[in-house]
Structure formats: C-alpha cells, structure tokens
A protein has these predicted regions:
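Cell wall/extracellular polymer interaction/catalysis modules
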Residues: 1-27, 51
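Exported/periplasmic cell-wall-interacting domains
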Residues: 16-19, 28-109
Length: 109
C-alpha cells in the first residue's frame, strides 16, 4: 500500500513531524483531535477524524477530509500540526491493515 500524504509543516519547528522510529500505540475510530487547551479551556482547533492511529504522543496518522490535495511540497508551508494527514479513500484501508505495535518510520528527504 502507498499513497500521497501531508506531514507536519517543515518550516515551522513546532509543527514538524519528528523523525525517528516509533510504534503504533493503538487505533481508534471517530475521534476529535485537539491540542492542549488554552488557559480559558478553549482549543485552537478541533479536527474530527474517522481513523486515528497515534505513534508519538499526540502525533499520529489519520484521515483529513479538509484537504483536497496530498503529496508534493505541501508539507513545506501548509503541512499539518505534526500528524500524517491521509486521504479519506486510503485511511480506512490502512486502518484495517495496521495493528498496535507496528513500526512507523518518519524521515525527510
């Protein structure tokens, strides 16, 4: 299996997907992804996803129905907050094929 995807925003160190070898913690359906809350309890964003597969703290693979394009150099300036954004058409198939403990290798070329 392979697909184009969008990783963390490369030119923003706080949003770059960290390189390294990780292992899938678990997988869950129908989650809402949020950053740490602001002092007033609100969130800067809330992203509902159908497929959530975390591998490094709050960083994981998930579907991204708000994106219409994947791959290429999008990650340089318009990447994610650190997660791997997958096309909806691919995310479900990938979710069904991966299990907790599966190695995840992240790197930039």
């Amino acid at each position: 299996m392979d697909t184009d995807f969008v990783s963390g925003t490369y030119y923003n160190a706080d949003r770059r997907t960290p390189g390294g070898t990780y292992y899938l913690y678990y997988k869950q359906r129908d989650q809402v992804l949020r950053p740490a809350p602001n002092p007033d309890g609100s969130y800067d964003y809330e992203s509902p996803v159908d497929y959530w597969m975390p591998f490094n703290g709050g960083i994981g693979l998930h579907d991204a129905d708000w994106r219409w394009k994947f791959g290429g150099s999008i990650y340089l300036y318009s990447g994610s907050h650190g997660c791997i954004n997958l096309p909806v058409s691919f995310a479900g198939k990938f979710y069904e094929s991966i299990e907790a403990g599966c190695p995840i290798v992240c790197f930039y070329r």
